[in-house]
Amino acid sequence: NQCIHNGFGLHTFKEELTGPEYAARYIDMIQEEKIPFKLNTMVIDISRDRVVTAVNREDGLFSVKAGAVILAMGCRERPRGALNIPGYRPAGIYSAGTAQRLMNMEGCSVGRKVVILGSGDIGLIMARRMTLEGAEVKVVAELMPYSGGLKRNIVQCLDDYGIPLKLSHTVVNIHGKRRVTGVTLAQVGTDRKMIPGTEEYYACDTLLLSVGLIPENELSKGMGVSISPATSGPEVNDCLETSVKGVFACGNVLHVHELVD
């Protein structure tokens, strides 16, 4: 629901939908089939014999014995702590998805002068979104020599708004104690190490991080599912069954997909 931009459904429904419209199609399908579901419910454990333990306000702690379990936990954003960026920890540093939720669902402005690290699709879309909300996006920096987002998003979100994209660049310092006051970018070589003398300072009050997604597999690991080092998701057979009998995986928990369709 926080993805209020369009571009969804082109492959599945053969029409262009916003995120909430796309989600509503599947909600309607579930209701039409009268499939029971529980909202605001957190699964805290799945055993190898497929007993699912969950908790919510209405039922408290409860368990369900399943004949089959489908893992569909999705993925999460890589946090700042995984990036080893020097500097203080001031206010004004957000993952792109957090900023997206704050702006689109909570109605909060996260900043006025913005630098974005990473050119994943969420980061590119947020560059456009923040520009439309009146913020100034100074630059989008990408560590790799190529963008991590779709070509159409580079054109529609950066080129159309004159937002510069610096490839083979990364943030090497964050300035500011209470609030971000600026960041220093530098060019990196093929070994991804900073090239001395290429530092550039950008004054800003906000840094958005769009540095990749990680399949959410804590539950998978807890039940002993084998994880692929290539995808960070479960290893599956041709039927998408994991190494645990009767447990299947799909979607972004299996591997990060470029398109929701």
Can you annotate each of these PLM segments?
Residues E58-L61, T98-G111, R192-E199:
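A short, basic/flexible loop-to-alpha-helix module at the beginning of a structural domain
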Residues L71, I93-M103, T206-L254:
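FAD-site-proximal beta/loop scaffold in flavoenzymes
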Residues N1-R25, M29, R101-N104, V110-Q156, ...:
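Beta1-alpha1 glycine-rich phosphate/pyrophosphate-binding loop at the start
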Residues C75-V115, S119-L124, A230-D238:
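Glycine-rich dinucleotide-binding loop and its adjacent helix/turn
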Residues N1-G60, V64, A68-I85, R89-G92, ...:
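Iron-sulfur-cluster electron-transfer modules
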